[in-house]
Design a protein with these regions (language model features):
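Conserved ABC ATPase signature
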Residues: 59-63, 67
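ATPase nucleotide-binding modules
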Residues: 148, 152-212, 219-239
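A short, proline-enriched helix->beta-strand linker immediately N-terminal to the Walker B motif
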Residues: 78-82
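ABC ATPase NBD coupling module
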Residues: 1-7, 31, 36-41, 150, ...
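Conserved ABC ATPase "signature" region
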Residues: 37-55, 106-107
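Catalytic Walker B motif of ABC-type/P-loop ATPase nucleotide-binding domains
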Residues: 84-88
Length: 259
């Protein structure tokens, strides 16, 4: 792999347990025949970039999970690879540490101008670190684009489900469902919950539904509303009690057709 100019970072970091931090980071440089003096300068710079100044002589057995992944990243970056492949690198870390490292690693890779391919099953992780996302399914790329593009227009039911969209609605031959006429004919559409407004039930121009669930999620509350035989989820900053009747108002761009 190193002969092809590819650096690798794995979920379990795969550090050499019999080597200290400095020797781990220097491994690729040593294989490439980089002279000792230059090698040590590059190792020191890599450790500085990943926030591990002063860790050179540390045994890898004494490192935390986050520190070990930083060492693995420094080792992969040290030889200056054409491509960096990260295979679920944060999967074994707790959520708080994972979120912090995702931001730091993404910023570092951009600062270095490093081309990277990051493999993950975590949607939020992909959105946070990627400039472009490819959603794979059945051995093929199902959708590719920026995080914003892929989220707004998944293209297919498969991709929408992979991304965690829950408002996937089947329309009849007239393009109708309990929310009204959403298309010209039969098919499946995505209704973006963040483009749905919950209003007073007295608004006769909009369908009226009943709140069947209200799930607190910190900054927002996920409100699930039953309209006829359909239930949709809407994030809301307002507290709406279960059993309340509300109008469901679709803003422009709320409805996206899917294949």
């Amino acid at each position: 792999v190193h002969r092809r100019g590819v650096g690798l970072v794995f979920q379990d970091n795969a550090l050499f347990p019999h080597r200290d931090v400095e020797d781990n980071v220097a491994f690729g440089l040593r294989v490439a025949g980089v002279p000792v003096e230059s090698r040590m300068r590059q190792v020191a710079e890599m450790l500085r970039l990943v926030g591990l100044d002063g860790f050179a002589a540390r045994s890898v057995d004494t490192l935390s999970g986050g520190e070990a992944q930083r060492v693995a990243l420094a080792r992969a970056l040290a030889p200056g690879p054409r491509l960096l492949l990260l295979d679920e690198p944060f999967g074994s870390l707790d959520r708080v540490l994972r979120d912090r490292l995702v931001g730091e690693v993404g910023g570092l890779l951009r600062a270095l101008g490093q081309t990277a391919l990051h493999v993950t099953h975590d949607r939020d992780e992909a959105f946070a670190i990627a400039d472009r996302i490819a959603v794979l399914g059945k051995g093929r790329i199902q959708r590719i684009g920026t995080p914003a593009e892929v989220w707004a227009e998944p293209g297919t039911v498969y991709v929408a489900r992979c991304l965690g969209h829950e408002n996937l609605i089947e329309l009849d031959s007239g393009g109708r469902c309990p929310l009204g006429r959403l298309a010209k004919g039969a098919g499946t559409v995505l209704v973006h919950g963040d483009r749905v407004v919950i209003g007073p039930s007295g608004d006769n121009s909009s369908p009226v539904g009943t709140v069947v669930e209200s799930v607190f999620r910190g900054e927002t509350t996920l409100v699930r509303i039953r309209v006829g035989d359909l239930v949709i989820g809407v994030p809301s900053t307002a507290r709406v009690g279960v059993g309340s009747e509300v109008a469901v108002i679709l803003e422009p761009g709320a409805v996206v057709p899917l294949d």
